[in-house]
Amino acid sequence: MRHRKSGRQLNRNSSHRQAMFRNMAGSLVKSELIKTTLPKAKELRRVIEPLITLAKQDSVANRRLAFARTGDKEVVGKLFNELGPRYEERPGGYIRILKCGFRTGDNAPMAYVELVDRPEVEEVVETEDAAAE
């Protein structure tokens, strides 16, 4: 029976799962938008939300906890220097999961995972004058 067993197994052993979510959390913090399968996205929420909540209070102890969970100094730096202050007033719900169709090949449901309130990247539109020069 699986009573009181939380979390998804995702057909992986525990060390593989832990490494996968550590890498996914790092990728999400660095790029602020990733594409993955829907079950992985839903499970990633359980990893990244407590990390951002931890980053709201900058202390050596919290930085060490975040490093223990991510294993990357660059990720910890961005968490505490950018994301913590950005979400200071938000009481949770730091990521958004958007369904984006199905993967070619195995038809797995795919989703975008993005940080809420992330800065919009403006696309550069070339005009005819700029293209001529």
From Swiss-Prot:
Gene Ontology biological-process annotations: translation
Pfam families, per database record: Ribosomal_L17
Gene3D superfamilies with a match to the protein in the record: Ribosomal protein L17
Gene Ontology terms for molecular function: structural constituent of ribosome
Domain of life, per lineage: Bacteria
Sorted UniProt keywords: Ribonucleoprotein, Ribosomal protein
InterPro entries in UniProt: Ribosomal_bL17, Ribosomal_bL17_CS, Ribosomal_bL17_sf
A cellular component annotation (GO) from this entry: cytosolic large ribosomal subunit
Family membership noted in the UniProt record: Belongs to the bacterial ribosomal protein bL17 family.
Subunit organization: Part of the 50S ribosomal subunit. Contacts protein L32.
Protein name, UniProt field: Large ribosomal subunit protein bL17
Organism: Pseudoalteromonas atlantica (strain T6c / ATCC BAA-1087)
